[in-house]
């Protein structure tokens, strides 16, 4: 069974690149450009991995992390932002990591072998 990735980010170019990268590696990829659409897809698709940007048109994505973790505790969440640093979101949950944009291809390759 193919793993599903949900990307919630308003940067169309970033989403296009990420979608292409993961589709070539046999992942199913869903994209939402705002929190509202992302939450709907999260509920409907039950992804294995979530890329969640913080600065979205309809709010701060990271504020939804507690709700997401409560609903899907096994979900691997990768919080991404060009404007924040890892210290801005501190968690002890091993399923949550923080990546700063731009994301390097080396980091993607190492994380998703």
Regions found by a protein language model. Name each.
Residues 12-30, 96:
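Two-component/phosphorelay signaling modules centered on CheY-like receiver
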Residues 31, 56-59:
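Residue-level signal for the "D+5" position in two-component response regulator receiver
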Residues 31-49:
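Acidic, metal-coordinating helix/loop segments flanking the phosphotransfer/catalytic sites
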Residues 34, 60-63:
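Acidic catalytic/metal-coordinating carboxylates
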Residues 53:
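Active-site residues of response regulator receiver
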Residues 62-73:
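Short amphipathic alpha-helix used as the core "switch/output" element in two-component signaling
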Residues 103-112:
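C-terminal output helix
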């Amino acid at each position: 069974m193919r793993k599903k990735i949900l990307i919630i980010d308003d940067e169309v170019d970033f989403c296009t690149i990420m979608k292409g990268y993961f589709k070539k590696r046999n992942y199913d990829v869903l994209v939402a450009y705002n929190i509202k659409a992302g939450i709907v897809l999260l509920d409907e698709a039950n992804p294995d991995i979530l890329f969640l940007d913080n600065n979205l048109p309809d709010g701060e994505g990271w504020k939804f992390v507690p709700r997401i973790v409560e609903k899907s505790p096994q979900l691997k969440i990768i919080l991404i932002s060009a404007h924040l640093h890892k210290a801005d979101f501190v968690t002890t949950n091993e399923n949550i990591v923080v990546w700063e944009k731009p994301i390097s291809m080396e980091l993607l390759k190492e994380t998703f072998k």
